[in-house]
Each structure stands twice: as structure tokens, then as C-alpha cells.
């Protein structure tokens, strides 16, 4: 059984908005179905939300990626509608101003401590979402650093990268770091 499903940044701007892609749009039904299955199985679901402020263009990320996106409170910051419909009570979300969420990493580590699995041994954590080559890989590696013995799983069919090539490259990076890629 999976101890946690982590859904990364399935927000409008990354799926159907200013940074969206047909690949990201294509995974929405499968991600929503996976969330529903996790809920039915009693698996905790955690969401991340890329969250920027109005001064985004003045930030380091804004200088390197000059496309204002996921501005707090904007329509693009909200979850893609089908993903929003798949949400249920008890879900936790973490807003993050950058690619990886240290708050998420600490949350997962605390859960491991509660279970008596300080290194993550015996835990299975699944990640999915967008973008494979930016936020998915960043969060997977943060969790791997915090819980080196946990089984981390990334289902490639439930992820989309900036491009198909970058998606594949990120999957290979995660495989190299002993993350199971389906």
C-alpha cells in the first residue's frame, strides 16, 4: 500500500494556461483517477501549489522564466478543474515559492517519524504531476534526501515535462537516484 500520494502543481497555468501543454492536459484524467483511487484506499493525498506573488518578474525565477504564472489568487494559480473535483476532505496542500518544497519534505519526514520509520524504511510514497523536469524531480530528490530508505515511485504516465525530451531526461535522473519510475 502507498503511504502517501503527492500531486505536484496540477494548476491551471501549468496545464491549460500560460505554461500548459498538450502533454500536461493529457495526464489530467489519469491523475484525477489516481487521486480518486487513493482516496478510496485511504491513502493520504498531499498537493503542492506553485505560488508566486505580484513581484514574480523581479525574482530570480522571473528573470530566468519571464512568464508570470501561478500568481497567488489568480485563476492560473487554482487547480485544474478536474483535479479540483478529485480533491476531498483531509487533503493537505503546501504552497511553495520555488521548485521544491522544504515544508513538504519536513512533513513527509515527520510522518515517517510518527510511523517509526525515521529513514523511511517500509514506506512507499508516490509522486505525480508537472513539470517532471522541474518540480516533480526537485520534490522527489528532497524526499529521497530526507528518507533514503523509502520506496519512492513516480508513474511516468501521470507526469508531464516542459517538453517530452525533458520529461524523459528527468525520469532518467530519478532512476539514477534510485527512484522507481513506472
Named regions from a protein language model:
Residues 49, 129, 156-157:
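Short secondary-structure boundary segments
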Residues 87, 108, 112, 146-147:
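Active-site catalytic pocket residues across diverse enzymes, especially alpha/beta-hydrolases
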Residues 149-155:
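Short hydrophobic/aromatic-enriched beta-strand-loop microsegments
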Residues 95-140, 160-182:
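Conserved N-terminal glycine/acidic-rich loop preference
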Residues 1-93, 114-119, 153, 162-176, ...:
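Active-site acidic carboxylates
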Residues 33-37, 137-147:
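Histidine-anchored nucleotide/phosphate-binding helix
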